[in-house]
Amino acid sequence: MTGKTVTRADLAESVFRKVGLSRTESAELVETVIDEICNAIVRGETVKLSSFATFQVRDKNERIGRNPKTGEEVPISPRRVMTFKASNVLKTRILKAHVSRKVKLKPQNPAP
């Protein structure tokens, strides 16, 4: 892992360099796309970005949990959660990048 976090500014800069919009237009485009995704999720819609991932809101029922320290049963209230499911295309890209990185880092056996 590189430890790098990609920010909105990074995405806007990438749009600026690759698409040719101005920096302001690039930032506005990124914000608009993020806003549309967020609004759809808030409305309870599933957002599917082909070859990337699916964002979905799920309702979770009330259930009984346990306090790990005391073992006491505690009710967990019903709630809505968002799930992110990577597409098979993205999973494959991640795996290939991991494998190629691992091969590059593999120590060479010294010649006899």
Curated annotation (Swiss-Prot):
It holds the Pfam family Bac_DNA_binding. One of its GO terms (molecular function) is structural constituent of chromatin. Gene3D superfamilies: IHF-like DNA-binding proteins (4.10.520.10). Keywords: DNA recombination, DNA-binding, Transcription, Transcription regulation, Translation regulation. InterPro entries: Hist_DNA-bd, Histone-like_DNA-bd_CS, IHF-like_DNA-bd_dom_sf, IHF_alpha. GO terms for cellular component: cytosol. SMART domains: BHL. The keyword Protein biosynthesis does not apply. GO terms for biological process: DNA recombination; positive regulation of metabolic process; regulation of DNA-templated transcription; regulation of translation. Heterodimer of an alpha and a beta chain. This protein is one of the two subunits of integration host factor, a specific DNA-binding protein that functions in genetic recombination as well as in transcriptional and translational control. Belongs to the bacterial histone-like protein family. HAMAP family: IHF_alpha. This is Integration host factor subunit alpha.
